[in-house]
Amino acid sequence: MNTNTPAHPPEGAPLSEATQAALASAEHAPDSPGATHIRSFVHRRGHITQRQRDALEQLMGKWSVPYAPRPLDMAATFGRQAPTILEIGFGMGETTEKIALARPGDNFLGVEVFNAGVGSLLHRIEESAIANLRIVQHDAVEVVRDMIAPDSLAGVHVYFPDPWPKKRHHKRRLLQPPFVALLASRLAPGGYLHCATDWEDYAVQMLEVLGGEPLLRNTADGYAPRPDFRPQTKFETRGLRLGHGVWDLMFKRA
C-alpha cells in the first residue's frame, strides 16, 4: 500500500553528492513555484534503512531512469520491444516486484517519489534480477505528461493511492478528471487502467471520474473483481479479515 510516507536520510548519514543530485527532481516541496499542479504527496522527514540507502547509492544508475521533459524511448530503456505497463505510486515495491516477475513478457515502469520506497524496490530488482522493471523517481503527473508518448501504454496500475480523507484535502487526490484524461490519452487503444483503493469514499469518486472520461469504458458493471495478476497484500488480507472493503476498478481505452 502506498501510504505516501516520505523518507529522507536521517541526520548524520547523508547520501553522496552524486546520489543527491540524481534524486533532486523528487525532493521539491509540494506546490512549489515550479509546480504546475497541486501535488498528491507531501514530503516530511522519515526513516530510511541502510539497505535502502545502499540501493539508492549503488543501483539508481542501473535500474532507474532520470526524469526528462521528453518522451521516453521504451525500447531503448528496456532493451526490447514489449508492451509497457506504468505503475504509479508503488510504495515499498512488493506488489510491483511480484507482478513484474509473473509477467516477464511485459515491461514495467514504476513511478514513486519517496526514497524509502525507491530504495526498497531497487533492492528487490537487483536481488530478484527483474530485467523488465525500471523506476522513475519523480512526480507522476509530470512523468505521464512529459515522458509517456500518446497511445503508447498497454496498461496503467494505480494501487491504493493516498485517499486524503479530509474533505478540504480532496483536491490533492491523484485521480482527478484532468489526470485521468491524461492517462487515457497515453493508453493505446485496448489498453487498461486498473485502480484499487481501500477507502470507500475514494472508490466512489474514482468510479465517477473514470466513468466520466470519454476515452475509457468500464469492463464491469461498477466495481470489478480483483484480477489474478494483482496479488493481495498482507495489509489488504488483514483488512478484509476485519471486514474492511477493497474496491478494484478496471477500465479500457476505447
Curated annotation (Swiss-Prot):
Disulfide bridge partners, by residue number: none
Q: Does Mitochondrion count among this protein's keywords?
A: no
Give the region (Disordered) as residue ranges: 1-34
Q: Which domain of life is it from?
A: Bacteria
According to its record, what are the GO cellular component terms?
tRNA methyltransferase complex
For S-adenosyl-L-methionine, which residues are the binding ones? 87, 112, 139, 162
Q: Which GO terms of the molecular function aspect are on file?
A: tRNA (guanine(46)-N7)-methyltransferase activity
Q: Which residues form the signal peptide?
A: none
Pathways per UniProt: tRNA modification; N(7)-methylguanine-tRNA biosynthesis
Q: Where does substrate bind?
A: 166, 198, 233-236
- Positions of the catalytic residues: 162
**EC top class, in one word?**
transferase
Q: Which residues cross the membrane?
A: none
Swiss-Prot/TrEMBL catalytic activity: guanosine(46) in tRNA + S-adenosyl-L-methionine = N(7)-methylguanosine(46) in tRNA + S-adenosyl-L-homocysteine
- Tell me which EC number(s) this protein carries: 2.1.1.33
Q: Which UniProt keywords apply?
A: Methyltransferase, S-adenosyl-L-methionine, Transferase, tRNA processing
NCBIfam families from the entry? tRNA (guanosine(46)-N7)-methyltransferase TrmB
Instruction: Report the protein's function.
Output: Catalyzes the formation of N(7)-methylguanine at position 46 (m7G46) in tRNA.
The entry sums up its family as follows: Belongs to the class I-like SAM-binding methyltransferase superfamily. TrmB family.
The protein depicted here goes by the name tRNA (guanine-N(7)-)-methyltransferase
Name the lineage.
Bacteria, Pseudomonadati, Pseudomonadota, Betaproteobacteria, Burkholderiales
